[in-house]
A protein has these predicted regions:
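N-terminal periplasmic "start-of-domain" segments of outer-membrane beta-barrel proteins
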Residues: 44-75, 103, 111-114, 121
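Conserved C-terminal beta-signal and adjacent last beta-strands/turns
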Residues: 6-9, 14, 28, 452-454, ...
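Transmembrane beta-barrel wall of Gram-negative outer-membrane proteins
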Residues: 194-334, 367-378, 383, 388-389, ...
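Extracytoplasmic beta-strand/coil segments of soluble accessory domains associated
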Residues: 83-122
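Gram-negative outer-membrane beta-barrel transporters
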Residues: 752, 757-762, 768-916, 956
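Outer-membrane beta-barrel signature, preferentially recognizing the C-terminal barrel domain
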Residues: 370-372, 591, 661, 690-747, ...
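N-terminal periplasmic accessory domains that precede
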Residues: 82-85, 102-105, 117, 133, ...
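Short acidic/polar hinge/loop motifs at secondary-structure boundaries
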Residues: 121-149
Length: 988
């Protein structure tokens, strides 16, 4: 079958059919002899209780194991953020960005392995992952969300953890006139500069012509100002076996290795230790404007046919500004205090310098726009009593692009060269940095150093056609069947304008001191840190000063002073102090993924000894072709520009490559449900599912970092031939629906997963660049002055001032072919492993409404275990599953006499969130986190339809902390604060 012909002919046929049924000759009049219906009073339960009843009914009547969340009323979802609502479901946990729910993990499988659909349609994403960002969509037009934890043949593939279907409102589902408007003010306590921001939304739904035609129009606009405080260890921690030191002459050294002497409790030879690359304090402000809109048109000329045309629009503009202060460790001779092994970490890590080093203070100001649209058409046709058909087609696109004169990411650095030593105490939650001379730094000391202006544009397009049918065999059985064609096109482009003047340019007095207001650091954090008590015999001056300088003023001054006359820069402005839109000069990647699928499912319902049961046996076939074309920047020289940085010089040329991959799977599924006693359901299921690799992993081409170090460079390469993860799934569940809005459930799940994707580090001499830190001059300097990078560079400047590869005024040493060894790049390449990993767990939930009191509670707990955990003692990548953690929720609610109140406690245990840092195969663990949210609303009796409400998130100001192989190896601590909103909602 020709897929293109199928797409066109089916769509054309369906549209013709819709037009045809509207023709007077085909649309016969309603039966005039129909009996007049008796008037029956229908009581509709809304609010919290109504939402819980509807969700419980959906769960009870499902063909597999499923959880659901339903709107409390039209246009009113339990939370303003969908991810915040989803985390209340058993086994679901979320990731937050700037304090707001963003992505979900289900049963230990991270966002990439949970397929999110909108009305059953796959949605495009622009992050290179497969995870949908729930922060982009408003909940105002959402009718419900279903989380399918077991697979059915009719479900699309891609979700090993779950398939999450977000369902939007449809006018014919709620006939009549409906109109809702709401307004709110949001106070985000995480920002010191912002103020209360508005949220407005409106929804109009109506049906006409005896409910045969319906229209729904909804829109929302939200502004939000937020901020956060971060403490980071930059690119991460470098890990070594204890035998590694800084003795290059003995052959036991690696870059970052600590001396054998002058240490307290130094790790032994067979232990593993880690050293930090830097310590950074970062203070960020963010402004967001989110716009959502949806138009739905429905036409049902007869009871047996219904056509739906819908368009959904989402836009999220995010502007970010930040200031930071940092001290980069140069791995000069260090003196440190260590924890006990076998995984050893510094309680205090310190370095002392012969020459003063930089105390860096950077700033950024940039913006991005995320924009997406989806146009869909759906036709449902009950052909006769036995056969019903559904056709669905949509074309959707999403784009992420710069939305600022400074690009999608910008960084400009200044520095005062005052640092005589640097030390960090890692004994507390907050890393505490001490810098010799740091608190005495003045605005006059600051000089402009390096800068990066980046522009990234990512676009994803999905065209999907689905044809489904249901054929009834008899009263007990029917067959579901269908075919689909899905094409996903991803295009990612990026270009950087980078200055590598990290040694500083200009002179004192170039920058106006009034542009550099000083502020203190530690009063901005609530987390506690150490006080260097583990280090005896020396006092440290804890850094408590940062210049919160204005990005634009310094950028403009630097552009004016440090752009040579006649110089043509790479930026669109003609200098190197702005971004470029010349994507053709840098990285350009295009990937097409085309999937064809077909399924058949047999459904059987009967009684066994008076106990109703249903059986669903299905088979799904998936065939996928991947084509990736890439063009990446090439480099022709390596320049040693600072103690710890070797910059790569772009040649202006690009390398082109096209790669392909394909795979196909036959995926069975069995779901069995029986009401073993009245109101008690037992369920059992077996299925085989796949989870496709993220889009970045299947992109072709090798991209290297533009900054290397003395040990070489790094980079990454995609692999279009990657296979999906494969999982054999076993599920069992028992559910007791003992009262209205009340149930108790327990479930067990087991997943045997193969084809785990791991990153192999491959040594490559790509570009054949001479390494200036690995050659004749370097070895002579090493023998003369030792391993300190600053001393080595100064020795080369002093002894080779006339060498063409040595630029003494510019403080640059370039690689020299024939004299220096070729630079080695560690290239991360994803590949499928042969290991099998078993993930299993238990889920427990109780939902109870206390009669007519109005009180109720929801309690759930999920335990997840893996047969293979990350081994912190192994220094290479491992096939460990990220996102695996236990979770719990406690929700108390009250609803009576127009008053609704809810308080929710959410907890997630520590979990592995990544198997790699920028320094290589070093793990990242997100520590256990809990959050308390609350909301209260009141229906004003004086004005029918008017509700006022108050919401509060993260009431106790919890923060998120990430560490490496040990708790002391902090990578990131982020404090995002609490958020409050007050508003009113009017429906009529």
């Amino acid at each position: 079958m020709n897929p293109t012909t199928f797409h066109k002919s089916r769509l054309a046929t369906s549209i013709a059919l819709v037009l045809g049924v509207a023709m007077p000759g085909y649309a016969v009049a309603d039966d005039a002899a129909a009996a007049k219906e008796d008037k029956i009073e229908v009581i509709t339960v809304t609010g919290i209780r109504g939402s819980l009843i509807k969700s419980m009914d959906t769960k009870r009547e499902s063909e597999g194991i499923l959880d659901a969340i339903s709107a409390e009323d039209i246009g009113k979802f339990p939370d303003t953020n969908l991810a915040e609502s989803l985390q209340r479901i058993t086994g679901v946990s979320i990731d937050r960005v700037n304090g707001e729910g963003s992505k979900v993990t289900v049963r230990g499988f991270g966002p990439d392995f949970n397929l999110v659909t909108l009305n059953g349609r796959q949605m495009p994403v622009t992050t290179g992952s497969r995870s949908f960002d729930f922060a982009n969509i408003s909940s105002d037009s959402i009718s419900g969300v279903e989380v399918h934890k077991t697979a059915l043949a009719s479900n699309p593939t891609g979700g090993i953890g779950s398939t999450i279907d977000v369902q939007t409102l449809r006018p014919l589902d709620s006939p009549g006139t409906k109109a809702i408007a709401s307004v709110a003010a949001v106070d985000d306590r995480s920002t010191d500069k912002g103020s209360a921001t508005p949220e407005v939304s409106a929804l109009y739904s109506n049906t006409f012509n005896d409910n045969k035609f319906g229209i729904l129009l909804s829109g929302s606009y939200q502004e939000r100002e937020s901020g956060n405080q971060q403490a980071n260890v930059g690119t991460g921690w470098r890990s070594f076996l204890g035998k590694v030191d800084d003795n290059w002459g003995a052959g036991t050294a690696e870059w970052g290795g600590v001396p054998q002497g002058n240490q307290v409790n130094r790790p032994s030879a067979d232990e593993v230790y880690s050293v930090p690359q830097t310590t950074i304090y970062k203070f960020e402000e963010q402004q967001r404007k989110r716009t959502n809109g949806q138009l739905v048109l429905q036409y049902s000329p007869r009871d047996d046919i219904k056509a739906t045309l819908d368009y959904t629009y989402m836009r999220n503009d995010i502007d970010t500004q930040y200031n930071d202060v940092s001290a980069w460790f140069t791995f000069a001779p260090s003196s440190s205090v260590w924890t006990d092994g076998p995984i050893s970490s510094p309680l205090v890590y310190s370095e002392t310098y012969d020459a003063k080093q930089d105390l860096s203070m950077g700033a950024g100001d940039y913006g991005v726009r995320n924009e997406s649209g989806s146009l869909g058409f759906n036709l449902e046709w009950e052909v006769n009593d036995k056969l019903s058909l559904t056709f669905d087609a949509h074309t959707s696109d999403a784009e992420n692009k710069p939305n600022s004169p400074n690009g999608s990411n910008s960084s400009l650095s200044t520095a005062g060269f005052v640092r005589t030593y640097a030390a960090t105490d890692f004994s507390g939650d907050l890393p505490v940095l001490a810098v010799g001379g740091g608190n005495a730094v003045t605005p006059q000391d600051m000089r402009v150093t390096g800068s990066v202006f980046g522009s990234a544009r990512n676009k994803s397009e999905i065209d999907q056609v689905q044809f489904d049918g249901d054929y009834t065999l008899n009263d007990e059985s029917n067959i579901d069947f269908g075919i689909a064609l899905t094409t996903v096109d991803n295009h990612s482009q990026s270009v950087n304008v980078q200055r590598n003047d990290w040694g500083g340019v200009g002179k004192a007095g170039d920058l106006d001191p009034s542009w550099f207001p000083a502020e203190t650091i530690h009063d901005k954090f609530t987390a506690n840190g150490g006080n260097f008590s583990a280090f005896t015999g020396k006092s440290f001056d804890v850094l408590n000063k940062i210049f919160m300088w204005d990005f634009e003023r310094v950028r403009a001054q630097a552009e004016k002073l440090y752009t040579p006359a006649g110089y043509k820069g790479k930026g669109d402005c003609g200098t190197d102090f702005c971004p470029s839109s010349d994507y053709a000069s840098d990285t350009d990647r295009y990937t097409e993924e085309e999937s064809q699928s077909a399924y058949v499912q047999y459904n059987y319902r009967n009684d066994w000894k008076g106990k109703p049961y249903d059986l669903h046996v299905g088979l799904r076939y998936e065939q996928t072709d991947v084509t990736s074309t890439s063009a990446v920047a090439a480099y022709d020289r390596a320049d040693w520009i600072a103690d710890t940085e070797i910059a790569l010089h772009a040649s202006g040329k690009r390398e082109f490559q096209t790669q392909q991959g394909d795979y196909d799977y036959l995926l069975p599924s069995i779901n069995f449900n029986i009401e073993i006693v009245e109101d008690v359901m037992l369920r059992a299921a077996y299925s085989e599912t796949i989870g496709r690799p993220d889009y970045v992993s299947i992109q072709g081409g090798t991209v290297v970092g533009t900054l290397a170090n003395r040990s070489g460079g790094s980079g990454s390469s995609g692999n279009p031939s990657l296979l999906p993860l494969e999982s054999q799934n076993y599920d069992f569940s028992a559910e007791w629906y003992y009262a209205e809005a009340s149930y108790l459930s327990a479930g067990y799940f087991r997943k045997n997963v193969t084809n785990f994707i791991t990153n192999l580090k491959v040594d490559s001499t790509i570009y054949n660049l001479a390494n200036p830190a690995d050659g004749k001059k370097y070895r002579e300097a090493l023998a003369a002055v030792g391993a300190d990078a600053a001393a080595i560079r100064n020795w080369i400047f002093a002894n080779y001032p006339n060498d063409p590869s040595v630029n003494v005024p510019g403080k640059v040493i370039s690689g020299k072919a024939g004299e220096d060894n070729t630079m080695i790049f560690k290239i991360d390449t994803p590949s499928n492993g042969a290991e099998e990993e078993t993930i299993d767990g238990w889920e427990f939930a109780i939902q109870h409404a206390f009669g007519e009191t109005g009180f109720g509670t929801i309690l759930n707990y999920t335990m997840v275990d893996s047969g293979v955990e990350y081994d912190n003692f192994i220094l290479k990548d491992q096939p460990a599953l990220v996102g695996l953690s236990d979770t719990a929720n406690v929700i108390l609610f009250y609803e009576n006499n127009g008053l609704q109140a809810r308080i929710a406690y959410n907890w997630r245990d520590e979990f592995l969130n990544s198997r790699g840092q920028d320094t290589g195969a070093n793990p990242k663990y997100t520590e256990a986190y809990s959050q308390i949210d609350a909301s209260v609303s009141y229906d004003l009796p004086q004005v029918k339809g008017l509700t006022v409400y108050l919401e509060a998130l993260n009431i106790t100001d919890e923060y998120i902390r990430v560490h490496g192989r040990a708790k002391e190896q902090v990578l990131n601590l982020t404090e995002a604060g609490s958020r409050y909103s007050i508003g009113a909602r009017y429906s009529f």
